Each structure stands twice: as structure tokens, then as C-alpha cells.
């Protein structure tokens, strides 16, 4: 009888060891999966830039609010820290949206997300509104001119 009890105890220890190994593997998988999903905090926008060119880090290089008809308009949305979100930029002329662009982003540090708009022909002369929206919430509307 002691041999049977010892064998049963040994089998129980093996099963418990296997169970613990499976639990450890499952926990490790969950930790890695959570890390791979990226930031879950909202994007922390710290500045919006408009201009005529971009730097290599995607921030605006030549800040401007006045453009010529053949220029490309650049917008850079600067964020700080860990966060994720959807950024939409809408360009409007005469009360009508003439261009819209959206990007899903996820950052762990300072970042710049760039958008650009170049007219197929020349931009009509006049006033333009550039609206920046993050996760469906309008953050700011900038006014620029084409002269």
C-alpha cells in the first residue's frame, strides 16, 4: 500500500508541475501580448504646426500661414509621451471640405505625425481652414491664406 500511495503522490506532483508550467506559459503570453498591443492611453497632442516643408522627424520645417497657389500645405501634429489614437486633418475652402486625411498612430515617446495637401492644379486664392481632430474630437482649427 505505501508503494501505491507513493506512486499516486508522484503522479499528483507531475500533474501539478505540468499545470504550473502551463500557467506560467499562459501568464508570459498575456504579458507579451499586452506589451505588443502598444499604448492604450489617449494621444497627448502638444502642438499643431502648419508650413511649407517638413523636417526629417516629420515636424514642420518652414512654418507658414500664407501659401502660394502651387505650394504644398503641410500640417504636423506633435504628441508627447505614450499614447495612441486616430488623427484626422480636414482642409476647407469656402465652407466645403476639399481634402481630408486620417492616420491611426501609436507612440511611446515624442512624435510628429505629418499630413500634406497639394492641389491637383493651383490652390484657389483665398482663406482656408485646417481642422485637426483626434479620436473624433476637434482639437483646433487653423486659418491659412493662399495669396
Question: What are the roles of these predicted feature ranges?
Answer:
Residues 33-36:
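C-terminal motif of bacterial Sec signal peptides marking the signal peptidase cleavage site
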Residues 119-146:
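Short, exposed beta-strand-loop hairpins at the edges of beta-sheets
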Residues 108-117:
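Aromatic sugar-binding surface patches on proteins
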Residues 38-69:
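Short, compositionally biased P/S/T/A/G/V-rich stretches that sit at domain boundaries
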Residues 5-27:
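Bacterial N-terminal signal peptides that target proteins for export
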Residues 98-108:
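Solvent-exposed serine/threonine-rich low-complexity stretches and specific carbohydrate-binding patches
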Residues 89-93, 132:
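Conserved aromatic beta-strand anchor motif in extracellular beta-sandwich/beta-rich domains
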Residues 72-80:
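Short edge beta-strand/loop segments characteristic of extracellular beta-sandwich folds
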Amino acid at each position: 500500500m505505501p508503494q501505491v500511495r507513493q506512486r499516486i503522490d508522484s503522479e499528483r506532483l507531475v500533474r501539478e508541475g505540468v499545470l504550473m508550467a502551463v500557467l506560467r506559459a499562459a501568464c508570459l503570453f498575456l504579458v507579451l501580448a499586452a506589451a505588443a498591443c502598444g499604448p492604450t492611453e489617449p494621444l497627448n497632442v502638444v502642438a499643431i504646426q502648419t508650413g511649407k516643408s517638413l523636417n526629417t522627424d516629420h515636424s514642420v520645417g518652414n512654418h507658414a500661414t500664407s501659401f502660394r497657389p502651387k505650394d504644398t500645405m503641410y500640417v504636423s501634429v506633435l504628441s508627447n509621451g505614450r499614447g495612441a489614437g486616430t488623427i484626422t486633418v480636414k482642409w476647407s475652402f469656402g465652407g466645403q471640405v476639399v481634402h481630408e486625411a486620417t492616420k491611426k498612430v501609436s507612440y511611446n515617446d515624442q512624435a510628429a505625425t505629418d499630413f500634406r495637401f497639394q492641389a491637383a492644379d493651383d490652390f484657389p486664392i483665398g482663406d482656408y481652414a485646417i481642422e485637426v481632430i483626434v479620436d473624433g474630437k476637434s482639437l483646433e482649427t487653423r486659418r491659412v491664406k493662399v495669396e
